Amino acid sequence: MSKEIILTQEGLEELKAELKNLLEVTRPKVIEELVEARNQGDLSENADYDAARNRQAEVEARIKEVETLINRAKVIDNSKTHSTGEVKIGSTVEFLSSLDHKTKEIKIVGAIEADPFSRLISNESPIAKAILGKKIGDTVEIKDILKPYKITIKSIK
């Protein structure tokens, strides 16, 4: 049984763009490198040929992986976030942290889209689990971490 992959619409579009690039740019380039390396003669001691074959295997594996992700994707429609006023996957949430008393902003995304350095937080993270379904003004405790703390939701976009 294959597990659904939760994605925002933006995440799905990024995967489609990556797949298109792999199929239309990267794969043909690798095939060209493979042909050039093969034309160098003896394949038994041809490092360029071996490298090109390895690169081809990597590209083909990534194509298959991205196709699988796209096929298993469950795209989250967050267009109703504003009407319900609740935090959902795809929501951008501004909150006040009790740790440093600073306002911060994060976007909740599916696990494969997560990038904490870009403030894209996995729906499986402790903070996302704590605020999903909550509303502006709610204060929640972030648990399952070394030092629990509280946050107050200031806005939801």
Swiss-Prot record:
GO terms for molecular function: DNA binding; RNA polymerase binding. Transmembrane segments: none annotated. Residues 1-75 form a coiled coil. GO terms for biological process: DNA-templated transcription elongation; regulation of DNA-templated transcription elongation. The keyword Mitochondrion does not apply. Keywords: Coiled coil, DNA-binding, Transcription, Transcription regulation. InterPro entries: GreA/GreB_C_sf, TF_GreA/GreB_CS, Tscrpt_elong_fac_GreA, Tscrpt_elong_fac_GreA/B, Tscrpt_elong_fac_GreA/B_C, Tscrpt_elong_fac_GreA/B_fam, Tscrpt_elong_fac_GreA/B_N, Tscrpt_elong_fac_GreA/B_N_sf. It comes from the Bacteria. Necessary for efficient RNA polymerase transcription elongation past template-encoded arresting sites. The arresting sites in DNA have the property of trapping a certain fraction of elongating RNA polymerases that pass through, resulting in locked ternary complexes. Cleavage of the nascent transcript by cleavage factors such as GreA or GreB allows the resumption of elongation from the new 3'terminus. GreA releases sequences of 2 to 3 nucleotides. Belongs to the GreA/GreB family. This is Transcription elongation factor GreA. It comes from Mycoplasma capricolum subsp. capricolum (strain California kid / ATCC 27343 / NCTC 10154).
